[in-house]
Amino acid sequence: MSQNRGFYIALTIFLIPILVISLSTAWYYLGFGPKTKVNYGDLIEPSLYLGELDLELDYQYLDIDSMERKWMLITFIKDKCDESCLETIYIARQVNVLLSREQGRFKRYVASTADQLKILEPSLISNYENLNFITINNLDLVESKFKESKVNLFQSTNLFVADPLGNVILYYSGDIDGKKLLADLKKLLKASKIG
């Protein structure tokens, strides 16, 4: 009797992990997995390479290979920078500050046409230190590249995250929640060893 009991206990101990693995595998492949995403921002698929967008930084062609390897927070502006646009730039600055010891891994940018930057730059420089400006040489090209990745660039205010290799990987649009953005950036920095 005790031999049978020991056998059943051993059999149970052996079969439970197999049963759990089998059920979880079936659960996953039948599509019952989680439907929510982990990050707040929207993933850009396929990612965009900044080097293909005909951009200038400091009056020179934007060459990712010669740039400092840092993560980038980029706001694209087409016409004017209204209240929501200014709020997005403000949130980007505050989130960068809240990254504390990791804040040196990020640089903040505003991208717009040369004519628009002439209007925007003086007021933004006086209010937001360490803000960099990217000139968009070909606005139609930039818009079409973003449309290929299913992103309507100027539908609402935006904030994009680009990795240190120049790939635009995440975007946020509309009213951006700074706390959720901060959580996303912390996850990115924790997972990344570059930049």
Task: Give the ranges of each region predicted by the language model.
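Hydrophobic membrane-insertion alpha-helices, especially the h-region
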Residues: 8-28
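Thiol-/selenol-based redox modules, centered on thioredoxin-like
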Residues: 155, 161-195
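Structural microenvironment flanking redox-active thiols in thiol-disulfide oxidoreductases
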Residues: 83, 87-127, 143
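Short, internal strand/loop/helix patches
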Residues: 109, 121-156
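Short active-site neighborhood of thiol/selenol oxidoreductases, capturing the structured segment around
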Residues: 65-88, 92
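N-terminal Lys/Arg-rich, disordered targeting/topogenic segments
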Residues: 1-3
